[in-house]
């Protein structure tokens, strides 16, 4: 009798019924946004990053399409963690999938206070944004320093009861930073974020983004993200959420084979639509059945056997 392959999986202390969700940054904190992910076929919702104080973000324009992807610099616009936590409390109450908060701080004390408040709001986990490519004094600048990563992760993980996930960007010190994050108490990793990029309008003769420099996301960074996941998993066997250019089931399967247990969809959620999540889930299930695997877990890290 035909039995569908099992897609549910445990990752970073969470149990996901479907191993695909949205990446932080493309949606906010409200219940209606989590419903977009649920109705689109996703298995978890990641909220937009919040900061200690409210931020207006960078001047417009924030987004610019490029071949296969998007260059963006929103500037972490958000109402501050206190206001966001109120919205997330309502989202948690209404959602039937895990809700993951995302925070971007400065001093360790800020990270701890934000994370503690969001834990009280009922979120399932907290993702530490240590990789925003255009957040001066934090983000990628912080995430490239393994000692600084360990300091922030340790401060937060030692305070919370819920899982802490470190989101790291690509750098020459990624494997070291990932190892330090795990040693400091991170239950899982998100790899990677968008990559520093710029687009210039040749007729206006100036950068197209209000902030001039932004982050490139979408298909162009997918091979880089696959390499990042492969290298980090090879060294750490960590629980990994993979992000970077996922728009098809094949992209997702690449990440699973490299070592990821779940994938986050960003640019394609915007360019294709929320239904891309269901398309990926169904494609992955079909792939497992055709290839003779009983579960998603069976292919996690399989490429390392080659």
Swiss-Prot record:
One of its GO terms (biological process) is 'de novo' UMP biosynthetic process. Keywords: Cytoplasm, Flavoprotein, FMN, Oxidoreductase, Pyrimidine biosynthesis. The keyword Cytoplasm applies. Belongs to the dihydroorotate dehydrogenase family. Type 1 subfamily. FMN binds at residues 24, 48-49, 129, 167, 192, 218, 244-245. Its main location: cytoplasm. Catalyzes the conversion of dihydroorotate to orotate with fumarate as the electron acceptor. One of its GO terms (cellular component) is cytoplasm. NCBIfam families: PRK07259.1, pyrD_sub1_fam. Its cofactor is FMN. Gene3D superfamilies: Aldolase class I. Binds 1 FMN per subunit. One of its GO terms (molecular function) is dihydroorotate dehydrogenase (fumarate) activity. The active site is at 132 (nucleophile). Pathway: Pyrimidine metabolism; UMP biosynthesis via de novo pathway. The gene is pyrD. Coiled coil: none annotated. Homodimer. This is Putative dihydroorotate dehydrogenase A (fumarate). Its EC number is 1.3.98.1. Substrate binds at residues 48, 72-76, 129, 193-194. It comes from Aeropyrum pernix (strain ATCC 700893 / DSM 11879 / JCM 9820 / NBRC 100138 / K1).
């Amino acid at each position: 009798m035909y039995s569908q392959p099992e897609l549910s999986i445990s990752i970073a202390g969470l149990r996901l019924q479907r191993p695909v969700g949205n990446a932080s940054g493309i949606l906010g904190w409200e219940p209606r946004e989590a419903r977009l992910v649920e109705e689109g076929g996703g298995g978890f919702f990641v909220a937009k990053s919040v900061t200690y104080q409210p931020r207006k973000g960078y001047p417009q324009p924030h987004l610019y399409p490029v071949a296969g992807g998007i260059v963006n610099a929103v500037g972490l616009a958000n109402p501050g963690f206190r206001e966001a936590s109120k919205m997330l409390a309502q989202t948690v109450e209404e959602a039937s999938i895990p809700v993951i908060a995302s925070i971007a701080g400065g001093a360790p004390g800020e990270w701890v206070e934000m994370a503690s408040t969001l834990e009280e709001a009922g979120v399932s986990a907290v993702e530490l944004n240590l990789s925003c490519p255009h957040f001066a004094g934090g983000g990628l600048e912080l995430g490239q320093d393994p000692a600084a990563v360990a300091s922030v992760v340790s401060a937060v993980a030692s305070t919370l009861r819920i899982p802490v996930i470190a989101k790291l960007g690509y750098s020459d010190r990624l494997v070291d930073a990932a190892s330090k994050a795990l040693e400091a108490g991170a239950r899982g990793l998100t790899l990677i974020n968008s990559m520093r990029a710029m687009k210039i309008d040749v007729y206006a003769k100036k950068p197209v983004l209000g902030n001039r420099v932004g982050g490139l996301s979408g298909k162009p960074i997918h091979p880089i993200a696959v390499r990042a996941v492969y290298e980090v998993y090879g060294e750490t066997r960590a629980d990994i959420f993979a992000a970077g250019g996922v728009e098809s089931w094949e992209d997702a399967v690449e990440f699973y084979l490299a070592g990821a247990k779940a994938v986050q969809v960003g640019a394609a959620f915007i360019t294709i639509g929320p239904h891309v999540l269901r398309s990926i889930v169904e494609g992955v299930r079909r792939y497992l059945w055709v290839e003779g695997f009983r579960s998603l877990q069976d292919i996690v890290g399989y490429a390392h056997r080659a």
